[in-house]
């Protein structure tokens, strides 16, 4: 059995996910009265988004995380705001994920919103210095795990014809970056997979929505030591608010900051050598990982 933390009512009343429309008549996802599952939810922006979801009126927030102490501390804080529960889950272990989802359904009910936020980075290494263990773990947690978790939630969401899956990728999944090649590869995979699922659901007129988020470096400790010449390191509170707003608006793809969308355009129009010169040398993107330390 997967360990869990937090008291929870024995009797559950299912509350259907509420929908409303914005000023343009577009259907929005309501966090209020929704059950929100967040992987990597006991630290960083995962924890912040969990708190914000409760503040927005989520009927419950469920967090999956590998760190048992962080889970306990997070749930203690969350329970001051609303209903929360935590499970110790190794998202790189498929059997653990499957068992955790079944336990989550039994004890918490249906998941309305899934936020794939768990991730790791091993940086400041050129590719030939990466170990097989580094590669396997990074790809497993960053790329495979979001698919495996979504594979548990999505059939139930489709059956109910409502739900939302948000996957946190990275700006490194749009623009190549030296000394983080494996991390970049994992995030390119997330973007390609997540947006493809969005199209699959859209083509069948499903009310299940998919949002892919590609943020720049966020100041959470995960990227300690990163230096950015042109773009500021993102504030975790503001970034978390933008992600939740993207979910509410059913935004298909959200780059943070917005200027990264311009780089995507330039990447498609400019010769590779020109793009490398502008982004790598002038803007300094290719040297951001030179002094990377990461979370201790």
Q: Where does each model-flagged region fall?
A:
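C-terminal helical subdomain
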Residues: 212, 228-264
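Conserved glycine-rich Rossmann-like NAD(P)H-binding loop of the short-chain dehydrogenase/reductase
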Residues: 58-74
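Substrate-binding pocket helix/loop in short-chain dehydrogenase/reductase
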Residues: 125-127, 131-137
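Residue(s) in the substrate-gating loop at a strand-loop-helix junction
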Residues: 170
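Canonical Rossmann dinucleotide-binding motif of NAD(H)/NADP(H)-dependent dehydrogenases/reductases
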Residues: 29-61
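The beta1-alpha1 cofactor-binding region of Rossmann-like NAD(H)/NADP(H)-dependent oxidoreductases
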Residues: 68-69, 88-99, 132
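Active-site helix of classical SDR
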Residues: 150, 186
